[in-house]
C-alpha cells in the first residue's frame, strides 16, 4: 500500500494540509490576541462615551438601518466613525481573516470527510484511514485542533470583543455586498458564548459543548476517533516509557486530545459511566491537571464538574489517600533522582565509556526526573487552581504539604535535569557523528595486533623466548582477516561475530598456555579491548536520542515556566554564571516548538517560517525577560557609583600639596566605586558566558542580548525621568518651567555620565546607544502627541520608534497632553500667552503685561537644548507645526461660519468693497467709511484675534527654536551645517533654473531628496518658519478685506513707543504686536499671493486716504492708526525679507522716510 504521507497520496496530503493549517491558525490567533485594540473592550468610561455609539455588538444585526440612520443624523458621529474606520480597518481585517480561517478549517475538514465517504479517494474510506498509523494520528489531530482553536479564541478574545470586531468589519468593508461572503456563518460560529477568562467568573451552562456543536460534524467520525483514542497508543509513546507508573505521562498528549474531543460528544461525559471509568483508569489514574496545547492548562476537577459520569469516574483519582500517595511518591522520586543527577553532573563523571555502558540507567534517571517535574509543576500551578473553588484549594494544599513542595528545589531539579539532558545529547550527537570512523579505527588496530602476533610466531620477528609455531601463526593471520572482514553496514552480524572473536581470543590464551609471555598476553588483551570497543560503538543508536527527545518534552510548561521567573532572576543576581545552566533550560523549552511545527513541516507549508518565528519570538522574549535582571542590577550599581562620584569624591586638582594627599585619597568611597564597578563587570561576564544559542529559529547572541537589555533599562529609566520631571502646576507663580528643566537636565546628565563610565566595563558604545535611545524616546512621544492632531493615527505596532524588545513605556496622561513633550509645549504656550505677556522682538524676551516683569527669554530654548538635546527641540518644533495646522484649520471653519454665513457681515463687506474701489484711489470721507464697517463687524473680531495671535505666538516660538538649533549646529557640527547650507543653495539654484528653462532637470515626484533634505534642514535650524505652507486652501471671498478690517480694528488698542515699538495700550484689552503681525503674515502665506497684494493695497489706500484727510486740518498731525499701519508694513517687509519697494508700491516712500520724525 502507498505510504499515507507520500506526496502522490492525495488522501494523506489533503488531511495533512488541513492539520498543518490548524496549527498555523492557532499560532495566528495567539499572535493576534496580543494586539486587540483596547477600544473594542470599551472598559473605561471615556471610551464608552466616545465610541459607544459607533461600536456595536450583534444587536446591530437586528436593525442595521436604525443604527446607521442614528449615525447619519449626527455629522460629528459620522466623522468619528470615519476616523475610527481609517485607524482600525487594517487590524480588524486581520482579525476577520483569522476568524474566517477557523470557519474555513472546519468546512474543509467536513468536506474531506464527505469526500472519504463518497469514495473520492480511491480505495480509501474513513475506516481504512483510521487503520493506517499516520492516518489515525492526523484524523484525531484534525478534530482536536478545531476544538483547541475554539477554546483559544474564547480564552484570548472575549465574546463581546469578537462581536464588536465582526460588526465593525461588516460595516467598514465590502463584505456585506459580496455574494460569496460567508459572514453569516462566521458570526454564528463566533458569537459570544458568555464565557469569561476572568478569575471567579461563572461558567455558562452547556459550555463548551454547545459552542463546539455550532458547526455540525459527522457523528460517526467523532465516535470512531474517540474509540481510537480510548483503545490505541496512537503515537507509540509507551515504548519510550517502559515503566507502568510512567504510563499516564507516556499517553499525556493523547489524553489532552481526548479531553478536547470528548466535548464534541458530551453524552459520554454525562452518562457513559463505564467509558469514563475506562478513560480515567487509563489516562488519569494519577493526574488531573493536564496541558492541552502549548502550555494551556486545565484542571479536570473544575472542567468536569458539570458532567455526572466524568465527575464520578474522577473521584477515585481524587480520593484523599490517592492524592497523598502520588504527592509523597513524587517527593521521594524527585529527591532520589536529584541526588543522582547531581552525581552525574560532577566534573569528569560523564565519560564516553561510562555513558555507553550505562545507557539504560541514564535514560531511566532522565525519565524519572522529567515525570516528577511534570507532575509537580502541573499539580502545584496557580493557573490550574481557582482560589474561589474550595475543593481545588484543599487538593492543592494537600499536595503542597505531602510533596514538601519548594519551588526553588523544583526549579533546581529542572535546571540540573536540563543540563544533564543537554550534556548527554551533545555527547550522543558527537558519538553518532564519529561512530563509523571510530569503529573502523578499532577494527584496524585489532587486525594489526593479530598480524603482528602472527609475525611473532613465524619466527621472523624475534620476541623473547617465543618459539616458532606455524599453527598459531596461521590461526592469528586468520583472526586478523576475520576482523578485517567485519562489515559496519551489517551491524547485527558484525556484533555477533565480534563476540565470537573475543571468545576465541580468550580460549587460545588458555589452550596454548600463552599466559607465561606477558607481551603476547598484552597483545591479546589489547585486541579484546578493541573488539569490546567495536561492540560498544556499534550499539550507539539514534533511538537513544529520539527517546531523550520524547522524554524531555517541556511543552506543558510553555506558560507555567513564567511562575519561576523571579527564582531564576534571584539566582542570576546572586550568581551571574548561573546563566550557563539556564541556557540548557531554555533549549529544553525550545523543544516545545516541535509540537506545532511537525505537521507544518511535513506538509511543506509556507506557514512554517511565520509560525516558527512566532513561537521562537515568544521564547526569546521570555529569555530576555529573565535576563533583564542583569541590566537592572547593573543600573542599580551604576546609580550608586554616580552618587558617589558626584557627591562624595572630590576631584583631584592638577597640583597638590604633599600633606593634603591623604585628604584627596578618599580610600573608602573609591573602594566602594571599585567594588560596584567590579560587580557590573561580573554581571557582564555572566551573560556573555551563555554563548550564541539557536532558540527555535532565532539566533540569540548574548552580547546583543546584553546590549538590548541595557538599552531597555536605560529607556525605562529615562522615559520615567522625563515623564516625572515635566509635570507642571498651571497655577504656579512664577512658572515651574525653568527650575524643572534644570532639575531634569541634572538627572539626564547623570544618566549620560554613568553611561560614559560604564561603556568600557561592559564593552558597548555608550554615546551611540545614549543618542539612539534618547532620540527614540523623544520621537516616539512626539509621534504619540501628534496623533491627537491626526485623523489616521500611528499605532504602536506601526511606529518606527516603538520596539517589542526595547519598548518605550507609556504613562497615564496627567492632563490634556498625552506625553511629557505635550506638557512642555503647553506650558511654554501658557507662559508666553499673548493675552498675558508682551514679546519684545529686539530682546527675544517675554514680559508680563501688567507687572512688566520678565517671564522668559531665549535662554529657555538653550535650557531645553541642554536637557532634551537637539531631538527635544526638533520634536517641540514638529509639535508646534501640528498645533499651527490645527489652529489654521479651526480658523478656516470659523471664517466659513462667522463671516460667509452672516448676511449682515457680508452686506457690510460688499458696501466697503464698493467704497474703496479702485484700490489705487483715495477714499473720500475715509474715517467714516472705515469705522462704520468696523463697528458693524465688531462681534467677529474677538475669536479672529485669538486665532491669529495663537498662530503668531507659535511662529515666534518656532523662530526661536530654529535660531537655537542653527546656533548649536554651527557650534557643534560646523561641517554638517556648511554641507547642508551648500546643498540647499545648490538645490534651490537648480529648481530656479528649471523654472526659467523647463528642459533642465528637476526632482521628480518619486524622488525623496527634497523630503529628506527638509528633515535635515529643519533639524539644523536652516529654515524660515514664516515661509512654511501649513495647509492647502481654496479661494475665499472677501478674504483680503476681512483681514484688512481686522488689522485696523486692532490698531486703536495699540500705541507706539520709541524704544519698544508698538505696545498694548490697556492691559485689560490685551493685544501683542509681534504675534499679531506674524499671525496675519502666516495666514496670508497660506493663500495665493494676489490676496496679499490686495491686502497690502488696502493698507496703502487706508494710509493715503487718512493722511489726505489729516492734511486738510489746520495743524496736520499723523494719526496713531496710520503709524500702526506703517509699522505693520515695515515689519511685514522685515519679516518676509522682501525688498522695501513691495510696500512703496502702495505708500509713497516719503511717508515711509519721514513718519518717525513727525512722532
From Swiss-Prot:
Changing residue 226 to T: In SPG8; dopamine responsive spasticity. Component of the WASH core complex also described as WASH regulatory complex (SHRC) composed of WASH (WASHC1, WASH2P or WASH3P), WASHC2 (WASHC2A or WASHC2C), WASHC3, WASHC4 and WASHC5. The WASH core complex associates via WASHC2 with the F-actin-capping protein dimer (formed by CAPZA1, CAPZA2 or CAPZA3 and CAPZB) in a transient or substoichiometric manner which was initially described as WASH complex. Interacts with VCP, PI4K2A. Acts as a component of the WASH core complex that functions as a nucleation-promoting factor (NPF) at the surface of endosomes, where it recruits and activates the Arp2/3 complex to induce actin polymerization, playing a key role in the fission of tubules that serve as transport intermediates during endosome sorting. May be involved in axonal outgrowth. Involved in cellular localization of ADRB2. Involved in cellular trafficking of BLOC-1 complex cargos such as ATP7A and VAMP7. It is found in: Cytoplasm, Cytosol; Endoplasmic reticulum; Early endosome. It comes from Homo sapiens (Human). Expressed ubiquitously. It is linked to Spastic paraplegia 8, autosomal dominant: A form of spastic paraplegia, a neurodegenerative disorder characterized by a slow, gradual, progressive weakness and spasticity of the lower limbs. Rate of progression and the severity of symptoms are quite variable. Initial symptoms may include difficulty with balance, weakness and stiffness in the legs, muscle spasms, and dragging the toes when walking. In some forms of the disorder, bladder symptoms (such as incontinence) may appear, or the weakness and stiffness may spread to other parts of the body. Ritscher-Schinzel syndrome 1: A developmental malformation syndrome characterized by craniofacial abnormalities, congenital heart defects, and cerebellar brain malformations. Facial features include prominent occiput, prominent forehead, low-set ears, downslanting palpebral fissures, depressed nasal bridge, and micrognathia. Cardiac defects can include septal defects and aortic stenosis, among others, and brain imaging shows Dandy-Walker malformation, cerebellar vermis hypoplasia, posterior fossa cysts, and ventricular dilatation. Affected individuals have severe developmental delay. Its main location: cytoplasm. GO terms for cellular component: cytosol; early endosome; early endosome membrane; endoplasmic reticulum; endosome; neuronal cell body; WASH complex. InterPro entries: WASH_strumpellin. Belongs to the strumpellin family. The modification Phosphoserine is found at residue 917. Keywords: Cytoplasm, Disease variant, Endoplasmic reticulum, Endosome, Hereditary spastic paraplegia, Intellectual disability, Neurodegeneration, Phosphoprotein, Protein transport, Transport. It comes from the Eukaryota. One of its GO terms (biological process) is regulation of Arp2/3 complex-mediated actin nucleation. This is WASH complex subunit 5.
